[in-house]
From Swiss-Prot:
In vitro, activated by tetrachlorohydroquinone (TCHQ) at low concentrations and inhibited at high concentrations (above 200 uM). However, PcpD would only be stimulated by tetrachlorohydroquinone (TCHQ) under in vivo conditions due to the toxicity of tetrachlorohydroquinone (TCHQ). Competitively inhibited by pentachlorophenol (PCP) in a concentration-dependent manner. Induction: Constitutively expressed. Involved in the degradation of the xenobiocide pentachlorophenol (PCP). Catalyzes the reduction of tetrachlorobenzoquinone (TCBQ) to yield tetrachlorohydroquinone (TCHQ). Also able to reduce 2,6-dichloroindophenol (DCIP). The lineage of its organism: Bacteria, Pseudomonadati, Pseudomonadota, Alphaproteobacteria, Sphingomonadales. Pathway: Xenobiotic degradation; pentachlorophenol degradation. Belongs to the PDR/VanB family. It comes from the Bacteria. This is Tetrachlorobenzoquinone reductase.
Length: 324
């Protein structure tokens, strides 16, 4: 991670097992430092001691300014992010983070919120539920997990639902005879002013999009985690022109991203997830047509071709001019 976005030095003060293969990590700043505000659904960028940068959702109540808490699932196919956190990170270690950003914000004025979560996708959803509880708003949760051992925050969720009189449907794959969580039913049954949220794996997101396809886009919100890059691998070479650097040009070779190309050539950029799910590397496009492969930008933004995420998106035109 590099400037101009400032980083904050944090210390790991507590590690808690939340469920099987799922830990929460409490991070606190230097004494006397007040952390930037955040809202439910926000994430922070974390720079790990092994050089890897990742984005993780915040799960603590949004009013807290003395700590950030993230919850991380151990991905057996991890390239070093979750595996490092689970196997090597210890209380007392220091990390640097990028302040919170939110691409999955809660609509606090909604008359009713319908929340869907799959696996570790519960993390931003749990943050939202805590905020909805503070507001006294109505909500319902539909949460799918592999099995009972993998349910994060089960006791807290059950208590929150009981206090709010909210519907809490827990779907366990191991007990469902191969059936997937029903998303279409809750969507159809919800009131016409309800706002819908979903965070989960790709299969769940596709089912969610199908279930909400006829709804106005402002009522449908979602966030991916661990997303695979979309689209076919690019075989074409293209040129990136940096408008703010006297038209400096770089060739992006097949198998490379714009971000990787810039970093290899000493051009520092802010980034975190490298998977197109956090939005940290969003960059303004001045000329050319991006090949959008992220999960953050809205369909309207993608159609405008005015901005792109350079960690994953490529180019449909032979030349891209970026506001860098």
């Amino acid at each position: 991670m590099t400037n101009p976005v400032s980083t904050i030095d944090m210390t790991v003060t507590q590690i808690t097992r939340v469920a099987k293969d799922i830990n929460s990590y409490e991070l606190r700043p230097e004494p006397g430092v007040i952390l930037p505000e955040f809202t439910a659904g926000a994430h922070i960028g974390v720079s790990l001691p092994n050089g890897i940068q990742r984005s993780y959702s915040l799960v603590n109540p949004q009013g807290e300014r003395d700590r950030y808490v993230i919850t991380v699932n151990l991905d057996r196919n991890s390239r070093g992010g979750s595996r490092y956190l689970h196997e090597q990170l210890r209380v007392g270690q220091r990390l640097s983070i990028v302040p919170p950003a939110n691409n999955f914000a809660l609509v606090e004025t909604a008359p009713h919120s319908v929340l869907f979560a799959g696996g570790i996708g519960i993390t931003p959803i749990w943050s939202m539920i805590q905020r909805l509880r503070e507001l006294g708003s109505t909500w319902e949760l539909h949460y799918a997990c592999r099995g009972k051992d993998f349910v994060a925050y089960r006791q807290e969720l059950e208590q929150a639902a009981a206090e709010a009189g909210a519907r809490f449907h827990l779907h366990l794959d191991e007990e469902a005879d191969g059936k997937f969580l029903d998303l279409a039913g809750p969507v159809a049954q919800a009131g016409q002013d309800s706002i819908f949220y979903c965070c989960g794996p790709e299969a769940m997101l596709q089912a969610y999009k199908a279930a909400t396809a006829d709804l106005p886009s402002e009522r449908v919100r979602f966030e991916h985690f661990g997303a695979a890059l979309t689209g076919e691998p690019a075989d074409d070479v293209f040129t990136v022109v940096l408008a703010r650097r006297s038209g400096q040009e770089f060739t992006v070779e097949p198998g490379m991203t714009i971000l990787e190309t810039l970093l290899q050539n000493g051009i520092s950029r802010n980034y975190s997830c490298t998977q197109g799910v956090c939005g940290t590397c969003e960059t303004k496009v001045l000329e050319g047509e991006p090949d959008h492969r992220d999960w953050v930008l809205s369909d309207e933004k993608k159609a405008s071709n005015s901005t792109m995420l350079i960690c994953c998106s490529l180019s449909k035109s032979p030349r891209l001019v970026l506001d860098i």
